[in-house]
Amino acid sequence: VINDNTEINRVYSFFNAIRGNNTPNEYQRVLAVLKKVMEIQECAQNELDYDELYELMLSVATDFDIPNPFPEKDRFIDVYRTLQGFEKLSWTDVLEYGDVKSKFRVPESVVDEMEKNFIEGFQEVLIPEAEKFSPFLERLVDTHYDSHFTLTTMDAFYYRVLTEMFDGNEMVDIKQTNIYQYEFTSEKYDLILSVPVFGIRDKVCENSEFICRDYDMIAVENLALHLKSEGILSIVLPARITFAGGNVRELREFLQSMYCLKEISDLPSGIFDNTGVKTLLFTITTGRTDEVTIKKFVFENEDARKTGNKKLLVQDDTFVLEDELSDMGDWNVNRIFESQDEDWIKFQESNVKKQELGAVASIFRGKAVNRKDLNGSIGVVNISNIGEYEIDYSNLDHFEEENRKIANYILQTGDLLIPARGTAIRIAIFEEQSYPCIASSNVIVIRATDESLSTTYLKLFFDSPLGRKMLVTRQQGTAVMNISYKELNNIEIPLPSIEEQRSIAEEYTRELKVYKKAIQEAENRWNSTLAKLQARI
């Protein structure tokens, strides 16, 4: 890919020359046709005249399965003349040209991590949907020149461009095939690098032969089938593979029974452009390993999203025995780190009574409200109403509904409210108002069902470093917070005597009042001082 600034400016001029009446989606294809025409002209024994070049262009466009990009011959001749003065572009430049937002590309930092799975000597390597790796394909092939690469794509145009890119290289095969279909190839490979489609709602047809119907889940199952003995699959998957139930749980169990997990790496949010889906990099092998390496990556640069510098640093790493991972029932990276956290270990080794939250409380999501009514008799507590210490009742939404439809959602004094999604975890205790209230569907309600639990004490615990870590580990796979209310049932909380809880809760409530009073007095004094000073101006 061209890096020199002077050449980049020339390239932009090159691109501008081909635009004309073509749409942005056509630029890349037009550029490919022109590049191929220029290559053929360079290799021709005799220089072709403009009529011959135009006929050649039509032939190349047909080969690329592209409609005639230059219906007007004169327009083609003008563009061709313009391009003759420019240096040759690579096929990588052709692949990378176009609307960045419309392309999905694997960042170099992720490619670098995947590349660590190469070994010295010959390997059969498969890179499906290779256009996603296009900026780095030539580098990978050149660096690992003694390995044989199979690059696949589902797109006919990309198939042709990749074929041109590696024309004459006997160590590279290009195939047009679909990795989301059974038996997409009969070959097996030593190493497979893949970033499948994820974050879309479309699923394959119900009569699919795979465990799951999601494209990303199909990819990991299907690609793993094509590993040789001691083969390795390095694949990026959305975080839901680590926690989801149903067919996804069945897929996890299948992968652990048939293969070995070698490494699970948590990737930072924003590593891939144009998606908010939380992702992890998995290393799966047909070889044997007793330990699974667990890593958590962060960006080297805090402003990575703005600067585009997405270099990765290992923030934390550990390992877990494969049998222990199987016993966990999921692949929750945060929970693995939590179990090895000093605060967690101290808690587990303490003599304090411990109890699963679901045994002493009912946990449920609020109700979706579609129609607001300023004069409605029922209040709705939204995420925005939940403060760090209390609920802002003055700005509640209201609506009207039949009692029977909301009876199970009416909030009671002492209910603990937690945002189910958003950017921050804030916890507050509800107090009954003069009108009935419910929580919105984005709010989780925890209600004590046993006299052994004080929800004020529970709030204080969840606000503690250990309690906050427990909540974070129940977060599901998106870039923004998304806590599963069902997962909260399994949280193990410290449960001292109710007398001790009440003592802690009473002191908390008393000191909170003192704190709020002091804050209010300080604000009043400050506002008064400002008013006096401004009056003297």
Predicted segments, located by residue:
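Non-catalytic DNA-recognition/assembly elements of restriction-modification systems
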Residues: F319-D373, S497-I537
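Sequence-specific dsDNA recognition surfaces
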Residues: Q355-V369, S384-T413
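Long recognition/docking surfaces used for binding and targeting
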Residues: E26-K101
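Conserved Class I SAM-dependent methyltransferase catalytic core
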Residues: C212-V277, L281-T283
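A short beta-sheet element
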Residues: A407-Y409, T413-F462
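A short glycine-rich beta-alpha junction/loop motif
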Residues: F282, P436-I444, Q476-R502
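Conserved S-adenosyl-L-methionine
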Residues: Y97-S194, G199-R201, P238-A239
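Flexible, glycine-/basic-rich loop-and-beta segments that form/coincide
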Residues: N274-K353
